[in-house]
Amino acid sequence: MRRITISFLLGSLFVFSACDLLEPKNDNHSTFDRVFKEPTFAEGLLIRAYTYLPTNDYRWDDVATDDAVTNDKFNNFMRMATGEWSALYNPQNFWDNSNRAILYANEFLGIVDKIVWKRTNPAVNELYRKRLTGEAYAIRGIHKFFLLRNHAGIGKNGQLLGIPIYNKFLENQEDFSTPRATFEESVSSVYADFTEALKYLPLDYGNISSLDNLPPGFTDITDVNHYNAVFGDMSRQRICGRYVKAFMGRMALLAASPAFNLTNNQALWESAAQYNGELLVDAGGISGLDPNGHLFYLKAQVDAARLNSGDNLDLKEILWRRPIYSDRVREQDNF
């Protein structure tokens, strides 16, 4: 009996220790909770939305007219014009990527107030929260704009339709059945995002030397270093107020264009003039325009801007650009 008892105890010890062996160990896989501990992971949601911007790569949508000519026999527009354009081949499909980016922006907006962006400085932490919130609204509005440009149109009911409006992160499959809003409702949604973004963003990024140089909306800041850390030179090329205003102007022009302004509503043209006029005033009016801006691609113009000199100058004609390349593929394909 004693042997049976000892055997039973040893067997029990083995069984219970084996249970521990079957328990999954920490395999270093990240969970969503990591965003609350490491702000760089939280910002990754926003950066992901940035990566889906159609302008991250060279596109020629704005110059693809009926008489466009190219030397590239595999050019997307040529393939579309010669019969390949279909549901299976659609180079103008922004539906998947832009909607995906909108959901990333929505998810980020849902957590941005819960993240500690700067543990050692509450004032700087609040400035980061402010800037990143503005960026998220701006990026969401930009993706809505591109969706409208490429996918809005007349529905089967004869109504001018826009896009499904997603202003929150979708938790389940049923939420994806949201119907398209009208074109007018969709445009209003874009403007709402841009207007909200402008509450948080300065017109331009860049270091300041004195509190007297603080832009409107930031006059409560008491330390120049705090402002420069968040809105200074290191933030250049991220979405700022000037870029938002430019997209508001583009949205207004799109809404006024014959493609979507089916009744030629003159008020829409006036609105487009107003939005773009404000941007020109911010640039200094006519004198702020580059007289050679239409030749921005020529070597003399690029050299004059000294883009690689580190002085933060740029071509006046260009508001927001991607990195500079030295290849000549564009010239080979189109000249």
Spell out what each predicted region is:
Residues 206-232:
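Charged, glycine/proline-rich intrinsically disordered loops and linkers
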Residues 54-62, 142-157:
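Conserved alpha-helical segments that form or flank metal/cofactor-binding pockets of metalloenzymes
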Residues 19-65, 69, 269, 292-300:
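Membrane-proximal, proline-rich intrinsically disordered regions
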Residues 1-30:
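Bacterial Sec-dependent N-terminal signal peptides
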Residues 37-41, 46, 50, 74, ...:
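Elongated scaffold/linker segments in the mid-to-C-terminal portions of large proteins
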Residues 184, 246, 255-274:
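Acidic, serine/threonine/proline-rich low-complexity intrinsically disordered regions
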Residues 148-149, 155, 205, 254-263:
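Short coil/turn linking the two alpha-helices of tandem helical-hairpin repeats
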Residues 44, 75-153, 171-188, 192-206:
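Conserved, well-structured interaction surfaces
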